[in-house]
């Protein structure tokens, strides 16, 4: 994760210096570099938190924030990878803004990890659907890809630390196997749920919930 992001930043910087990225587009790519730098700093803290979950529980900084804006910002990070694979995002977001209650830093990490997996395991020239919806004072966030899917005998194991299925080993040799473990522990720390629906050879959908902010009431 960190080596990929640093490499992406180096590529963008070289392309800005040699003129591959035109001047009028440089602000956009500088913002991506800054976003990634900040996210990696937060990831380091998340890994420390993960190590402490079993000892002291996880500390949450709860606030109201717009999950739709967070989704739109997070997908910008994956523009380069998506262009390489011919992937597109299909956003089905409820309302222009949708406020939830949660720890912004940690929820952003959930989104990054789920979208990163979707990009990684999607078939070329396919789409990734990200959806937000409201039911019974809960906001449901879904990330769905069209790709290799997860074998049935691996579904119950994907949340374990360092677990990687045989299919993912070939696709993601550099991954830590911590991503989904972090995701589940953060969701549970919020008192919420995350589920996975997957068919091998078809694709995977992750769905997690967050409390609807009273701002939406």
Locate predicted features.
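Conserved glycine-rich
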Residues: 191-192
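Short conserved segment of the HATPase_c
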Residues: 150-164
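Single conserved hydrophobic/aromatic residue that forms the stacking wall/gate
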Residues: 1-12
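Conserved micro-motifs of the catalytic ATP-binding
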Residues: 21, 25, 55-60, 99-102
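Conserved catalytic submotifs in the C-terminal HATPase_c
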Residues: 61-66, 83, 88-98
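Short helix-loop "hinge" at the ATP-lid/N-box region of the Bergerat-fold HATPase_c
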Residues: 118-119
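Short alpha-helical segment of the dimerization/phosphotransfer core of two-component systems
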Residues: 35-40
């Amino acid at each position: 994760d960190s080596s990929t992001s640093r490499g992406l930043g180096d590529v963008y910087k070289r392309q800005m210096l040699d003129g591959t990225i035109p001047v009028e587009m440089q602000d956009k790519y500088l913002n991506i570099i800054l976003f990634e730098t900040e996210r990696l700093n937060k990831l380091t803290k998340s890994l420390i938190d993960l190590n402490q979950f079993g000892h002291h529980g996880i500390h949450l900084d709860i606030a109201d924030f717009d999950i739709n804006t967070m989704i739109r910002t997070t997908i910008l990070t994956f523009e380069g990878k998506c262009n390489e694979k011919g992937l597109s995002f299909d956003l089905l977001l409820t309302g222009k803004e949708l406020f939830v209650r949660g720890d912004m830093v940690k929820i952003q990490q959930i989104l990054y990890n789920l979208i990163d997996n979707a990009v990684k395991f999607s078939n070329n020239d396919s789409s990734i659907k990200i959806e937000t919806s409201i039911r019974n004072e809960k906001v449901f966030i879904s990330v769905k890809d069209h790709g290799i899917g997860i074998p049935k005998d691996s579904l119950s194991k994907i949340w374990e630390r360092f677990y990687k299925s045989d299919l993912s080993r070939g696709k993601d040799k550099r991954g830590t196997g911590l991503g989904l473990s972090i995701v589940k522990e953060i969701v549970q720390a919020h008192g919420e749920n995350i589920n996975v629906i997957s068919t091998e050879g078809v694709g995977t959908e992750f769905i997690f919930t967050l409390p609807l902010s009273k701002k939406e009431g």
